[in-house]
Every structure is written in C-alpha cells, then in structure tokens.
Curated annotation (Swiss-Prot):
One annotated GO molecular function: NADH dehydrogenase (ubiquinone) activity
Protein name in UniProt: NADH-ubiquinone oxidoreductase chain 6
Gene: MT-ND6
Localization per Swiss-Prot or TrEMBL: Mitochondrion membrane
Family per similarity comment: Belongs to the complex I subunit 6 family.
Organism: Synthliboramphus antiquus (Ancient murrelet)
Gene Ontology CC: mitochondrial membrane
Amino acid sequence: MTYFMLFLGLCFVLGGLAVASNPSPYYGVVGLVLASVVGCGWLMSLGMSFVSLVLFMVYLGGMLVVFVYSVSLAADPFPEAWGDWRVVGYGVSFIVVLAAGAVVGGLVGCWDSGVITVDSVGMLSVRLDFSGVAMFYSCGVGMFLVAGWGLLLTLFVVLELVRGLSCGAIRAV
C-alpha cells in the first residue's frame, strides 16, 4: 500500500508538472485530467470517498470548461509539444525546484507530521470527510460567498473574452 501511495503521489506531481509546463492548452488538459484523477484516487485510498467524488465532479465539470474556452481562444496551427527543448527546460527547472523544496523541507523538519485518514480519534460513528463537509457549510459560509462571487466574475470575464467584436452576452443598455 505504501508503494501504491508513493506511486499516486508521483503521478500527482507529474500531472501538476504537465499543467505548469504546458506548451499549449491542448496538453494542459491532459495534465489537468491526470492530476485530478490521481488526486481523487489518492483521497479515495485514504478513505475519503465522498470528498474525492465531489472534487472529481468539480474538476472535470468546471475546469475542463475553462480549458475548452482557452483552447478555442488560443488555437495554434503548430502547437509546441512536450518534446521541444524549451518545454523540456521548463520541466527540468520545475523538477529542480521541487527537489530543492523537498531538501529544504527535510532539513527544517517539516516532514514530522503524519496523515489523518478516516477517523480523527479511534473508532467514530461519523467519518472524517463527512464531518469536514459539514464544517464547510457551517463555518465556511463567508468563503462560499467569496468563491461564488469570484466564479460569477470569472463567468463574466470569459463571456467578454469570447464575444470578440460582435455583440455578446453583456450589452450596453
């Protein structure tokens, strides 16, 4: 199980690396899907199946729509691939930064904490991921409002960017 968790962590880092060093939006979608599937699988293997399912639906439902808009806006006739030297240089530099962060984190002593999986204190009648979702709705009302306004603003920005020269969704009244 330890090797499987390490493999999922490595795949998650590689998916994030693919999103960060994407040469064109076409390949960024592949990295995002890889990172979201592996991250949700990681959460599911830790015992948080509900949160994993919710995040999977949000990532694949919401973020892929954003990438569809960016692909339609940045349609290149000759997109750069991951094999180009510039993109390989980005990837190597990101890996060097991650390795340096791991070394510094190990020297400082940031790796002493463990992972709390399903139960926080022994056998409980409520799983940790369900109580966490309840805490989102009880204590996180302000953050939900800020996130909702941010998503509404993002929707209007995307609609303005996509409309081009024609009369789009937002018109002067």
